[in-house]
Protein backbone atom coordinates (compact mmCIF):
# COMPACT_ATOMS: atom_id res chain seq x y z
CA UNK A 1 0.00 0.00 0.00
CA UNK A 2 1.07 3.55 -0.74
CA UNK A 3 0.94 6.01 2.16
CA UNK A 4 1.44 9.05 -0.08
CA UNK A 5 -1.89 10.68 -0.87
CA UNK A 6 -3.87 8.47 1.50
CA UNK A 7 -6.28 9.51 4.24
CA UNK A 8 -3.87 7.85 6.68
CA UNK A 9 -1.10 10.19 5.53
CA UNK A 10 -3.43 13.14 6.18
CA UNK A 11 -4.20 11.69 9.62
CA UNK A 12 -0.47 11.37 10.37
CA UNK A 13 0.07 15.01 9.38
CA UNK A 14 -2.85 16.09 11.58
CA UNK A 15 -1.57 13.99 14.48
CA UNK A 16 1.94 15.43 14.09
CA UNK A 17 0.61 19.00 14.00
CA UNK A 18 -1.69 18.42 16.97
CA UNK A 19 0.99 16.83 19.15
CA UNK A 20 3.49 19.55 18.18
CA UNK A 21 1.05 22.31 19.09
CA UNK A 22 0.14 20.61 22.36
CA UNK A 23 3.82 20.37 23.27
CA UNK A 24 4.35 24.10 22.81
CA UNK A 25 1.11 24.98 24.56
CA UNK A 26 1.95 22.82 27.59
CA UNK A 27 5.44 24.36 27.74
CA UNK A 28 3.84 27.82 27.89
CA UNK A 29 1.38 26.57 30.53
CA UNK A 30 4.27 25.19 32.60
CA UNK A 31 6.04 28.53 32.53
CA UNK A 32 2.88 30.33 33.64
CA UNK A 33 2.17 27.79 36.39
CA UNK A 34 5.73 28.24 37.68
CA UNK A 35 5.32 32.05 37.66
CA UNK A 36 2.02 31.62 39.51
CA UNK A 37 3.77 29.56 42.20
CA UNK A 38 2.65 26.06 41.20
CA UNK A 39 5.85 24.00 40.83
CA UNK A 40 4.06 20.63 40.84
CA UNK A 41 1.62 21.73 38.15
CA UNK A 42 4.50 23.18 36.10
CA UNK A 43 6.34 19.86 36.36
CA UNK A 44 3.26 17.94 35.20
CA UNK A 45 2.81 20.28 32.23
CA UNK A 46 6.51 19.81 31.36
CA UNK A 47 6.30 16.04 31.64
CA UNK A 48 3.23 15.99 29.43
CA UNK A 49 4.91 18.35 26.94
CA UNK A 50 7.80 15.87 26.70
CA UNK A 51 5.32 13.04 26.14
CA UNK A 52 3.67 15.04 23.35
CA UNK A 53 7.09 15.67 21.77
CA UNK A 54 7.69 11.92 21.63
CA UNK A 55 4.23 11.31 20.19
CA UNK A 56 4.94 13.92 17.49
CA UNK A 57 8.27 12.22 16.77
CA UNK A 58 6.50 8.90 16.15
CA UNK A 59 4.20 10.49 13.55
CA UNK A 60 7.02 12.54 11.99
CA UNK A 61 9.10 9.41 11.49
CA UNK A 62 6.16 7.57 9.94
CA UNK A 63 5.66 10.46 7.53
CA UNK A 64 9.33 10.11 6.54
CA UNK A 65 9.55 6.39 5.90
CA UNK A 66 10.24 5.38 9.51
CA UNK A 67 13.20 7.62 10.33
CA UNK A 68 14.26 11.24 10.52
CA UNK A 69 16.01 12.29 7.29
CA UNK A 70 19.72 13.15 7.23
CA UNK A 71 21.03 16.61 8.10
CA UNK A 72 21.40 17.92 4.52
CA UNK A 73 17.80 16.91 3.75
CA UNK A 74 16.64 18.48 7.02
CA UNK A 75 18.47 21.73 6.27
CA UNK A 76 16.89 21.89 2.81
CA UNK A 77 13.44 21.11 4.21
CA UNK A 78 13.87 23.76 6.90
CA UNK A 79 15.01 26.36 4.34
CA UNK A 80 12.06 25.57 2.09
CA UNK A 81 9.63 25.81 5.00
CA UNK A 82 11.06 29.15 6.11
CA UNK A 83 10.89 30.39 2.50
CA UNK A 84 7.20 29.54 2.29
CA UNK A 85 6.54 31.27 5.61
CA UNK A 86 8.21 34.57 4.70
CA UNK A 87 7.31 34.74 0.99
CA UNK A 88 3.74 33.43 1.06
CA UNK A 89 2.17 32.62 4.39
CA UNK A 90 3.02 35.68 6.48
CA UNK A 91 2.62 38.05 3.52
CA UNK A 92 -0.90 36.75 2.98
CA UNK A 93 -1.65 36.86 6.71
CA UNK A 94 -0.44 40.48 6.92
CA UNK A 95 -2.53 41.47 3.90
CA UNK A 96 -5.65 39.91 5.40
CA UNK A 97 -5.00 41.48 8.79
CA UNK A 98 -4.65 44.93 7.18
CA UNK A 99 -7.85 44.45 5.18
CA UNK A 100 -9.70 43.50 8.35
CA UNK A 101 -8.28 46.43 10.32
CA UNK A 102 -5.83 44.49 12.49
CA UNK A 103 -2.84 46.75 11.84
CA UNK A 104 -0.85 45.61 14.88
CA UNK A 105 -1.20 41.98 13.85
CA UNK A 106 -0.25 42.86 10.27
CA UNK A 107 2.88 44.53 11.62
CA UNK A 108 3.70 41.41 13.66
CA UNK A 109 3.15 39.09 10.68
CA UNK A 110 5.46 41.28 8.58
CA UNK A 111 8.07 41.39 11.35
CA UNK A 112 8.07 37.64 11.81
CA UNK A 113 8.30 37.22 8.02
CA UNK A 114 11.61 39.09 8.10
CA UNK A 115 12.87 36.77 10.84
CA UNK A 116 11.82 33.74 8.79
CA UNK A 117 13.79 35.15 5.84
CA UNK A 118 16.90 35.23 8.05
CA UNK A 119 16.18 31.66 9.13
CA UNK A 120 16.01 30.54 5.51
CA UNK A 121 19.33 32.22 4.73
CA UNK A 122 20.96 30.65 7.78
CA UNK A 123 19.75 27.15 6.86
CA UNK A 124 20.91 27.55 3.25
CA UNK A 125 24.36 28.70 4.43
CA UNK A 126 24.59 25.74 6.81
CA UNK A 127 23.61 23.38 3.97
CA UNK A 128 26.29 24.95 1.79
CA UNK A 129 28.83 24.38 4.59
CA UNK A 130 27.80 20.73 5.02
CA UNK A 131 27.90 20.03 1.29
CA UNK A 132 31.25 21.82 0.94
CA UNK A 133 32.88 20.16 3.94
CA UNK A 134 33.23 23.52 5.67
CA UNK A 135 31.46 22.87 8.97
CA UNK A 136 34.66 22.30 10.97
CA UNK A 137 37.22 24.04 8.73
CA UNK A 138 37.40 27.50 7.17
CA UNK A 139 39.71 29.29 4.76
CA UNK A 140 40.95 31.77 7.34
CA UNK A 141 41.35 31.78 11.10
CA UNK A 142 38.12 31.48 13.04
CA UNK A 143 37.19 31.43 16.70
CA UNK A 144 35.99 27.92 17.61
CA UNK A 145 34.18 27.62 20.94
CA UNK A 146 33.39 24.30 22.60
CA UNK A 147 29.66 24.18 23.29
CA UNK A 148 30.26 21.96 26.30
CA UNK A 149 32.95 23.70 28.36
CA UNK A 150 33.44 27.03 26.56
CA UNK A 151 37.10 26.46 25.61
CA UNK A 152 38.16 28.74 22.74
CA UNK A 153 40.56 27.80 19.94
CA UNK A 154 41.62 30.13 17.12
CA UNK A 155 42.55 28.51 13.82
CA UNK A 156 41.40 27.24 10.45
CA UNK A 157 39.94 24.03 11.88
CA UNK A 158 38.10 22.99 15.00
CA UNK A 159 40.08 20.48 17.07
CA UNK A 160 39.10 16.83 16.65
CA UNK A 161 38.64 16.67 20.43
CA UNK A 162 38.35 19.52 22.92
CA UNK A 163 41.68 19.66 24.80
CA UNK A 164 39.87 20.68 28.00
CA UNK A 165 36.75 18.52 28.31
CA UNK A 166 37.49 15.83 25.67
CA UNK A 167 34.19 16.34 23.86
CA UNK A 168 34.32 15.59 20.11
CA UNK A 169 34.70 18.07 17.27
CA UNK A 170 30.94 18.17 16.82
CA UNK A 171 30.78 20.44 19.90
CA UNK A 172 32.71 23.21 18.10
Map each language-model feature to its residues.
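Non-heme di-metal
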Residues: 1-172
Amino acid sequence: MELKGSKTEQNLMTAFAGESQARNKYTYFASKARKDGYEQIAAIFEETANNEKEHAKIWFKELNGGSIPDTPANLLSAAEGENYEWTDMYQEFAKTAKEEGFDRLAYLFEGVAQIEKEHEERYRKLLENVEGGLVFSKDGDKIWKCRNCGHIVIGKEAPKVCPICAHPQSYF
